[in-house]
Each structure stands twice: as structure tokens, then as C-alpha cells.
Amino acid sequence: KVLSCMAANIKDVFVGTAPDASYWLLRSEDQDTEQPIEEDYWAAAIEFADSVGIDVVNTSLGYHAFDEGYPAYRYRDLDGHYSLMSHSASLAADKGIVVVCSAGKSGRGAWKKVTPPGDSENVLTIGALTKDLVNAEFSSIGDTSDGRIKPDVMAIGVNSVVSGNDGRVSKANGTSFASPTMCGIVACFWQACPWLTAKEVIKAVQQAGDRVDFPDNIYGYGVPNLWKAYQTEVEKRK
């Protein structure tokens, strides 16, 4: 379902945000457990992604609490570097990869905050919106422990159109769907502006948000207009 948000191309029914892109599917999540070693798996996946020349990564997962016996992250740990995933995501940006990740679904819970790697400065963290462009109650919020705005931008994550392995189109809720929706759009934007670095892409997406003049820790910089971002970047080149 996550992949379909980007890659689906069902004529006259459902087209994802980057249907002509090429994809690698890398699994790091152990569905039977929730242990810190899964962050190592994720870091290994990012290393592999770099080795095969991947440009943009979507990750619709994050970690806050683990199985009994393992300590959970604390708010003070959300500094963009403390967790292995956040550190690895920053290294990926240094290597030229744009990492797009889901903010998380803790908005209704006691934790509320974005989950690593979403606290990384050099990651585009995506919150979920309703069709009316209102923040979804479940969507995790910021800020980070060092005072940075999170999430970065927003995308539809309530009643998102998705397609399963059987090809049937349905609807689903979650920042896990907001993230790939935005990821595909970001990939198209970068294709149109190939002279930008990964970090410049992130900055351009933030600056294209409809709340760029008044960002907060619920909506971030808002909904980005990447056509406007494209025009801005082309104008800079003149």
C-alpha cells in the first residue's frame, strides 16, 4: 500500500505521485518484535541504498518505544543525532540522498512527538492532513529537543487512496501514506531541478510551504507548492 502511493499506475483509476520512477524495496522491520536492532537493519538498508545509487528514500516507520527490557526514547533524545536511525539519515543526506519519513501516529497518545529518524535535521518529516487540509489527530508533532520545527511539511494521510498486492484500490489512514505521497512529488521536483543537492532540495520544499512565514510544530511549513518551488529554482539559475 505504501509503495502504491508513489508507484501505482492504474489507467483511469489511480496514479501515484512518481509512477515512472525506478524502485528498490528494502525491508528492515521485524513485524514480530520491536527491538533496537531494527535500527541497525535500517542503517544497513540505507548503506545499501547509497551503494546502488538511490536518490530518494521513503521510510514509513520510526521507533520510540521497544519491547519489554529495552528503554524507550525520551524527549531529550530527539536531537537529530542520538538515535542510530536519525544519525544514519543525516549521513545519508551528506551522501546526497533525500530521506522522506513519516512523522508517526502518536498524536493522540502520551508521547505525541515525531519518532526517529523524523527528528533529524536533514530529513523531510511528513505529517498527515485530512482532505480539508486539517491536521489529522493521530499525526505526531514537534518540536525536537533542540527546538527545531517538526514535522517539516504535510500531505494527505486520511482516506489516502492506496492499492494492495491484489490490485484493489481502497483508502487508508496514516502518516505512513502521507510520507510516500510527498516522497514521489519530491522525486519529481528533484528530477526537474537536478542541479540541487539533497540538502538544497529539503530547503526548497520547506520554503515552498504555505505556512513558511508562520511555521509551527503541528503543520510545520505546511503544504508545499512544488511548482512554485520549481519556478523559484529556475529563476535563480538565470
Show the residue positions of the predicted features.
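Solvent-exposed, polar/charged alpha-helical surfaces in well-ordered, non-transmembrane soluble domains
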Residues: 4, 40, 44-47, 51, ...
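Subtilisin-like serine protease catalytic core
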Residues: 1-38, 52-55, 68, 94-96, ...
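Catalytic-core regions built around general acid/base machinery
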Residues: 79-96
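Secreted peptidase-domain scaffold signal
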Residues: 104, 228-238
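Hydrophobic, small-residue-rich alpha-helical packing segments that form membrane-like cores
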Residues: 44-50, 59, 81-82, 109-110
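Hydrolase catalytic cores
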Residues: 3-6, 24-30, 113, 157-223, ...
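Active-site-adjacent substrate-recognition loops and nearby beta-strands
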Residues: 39-42, 46, 66-74, 101-123, ...
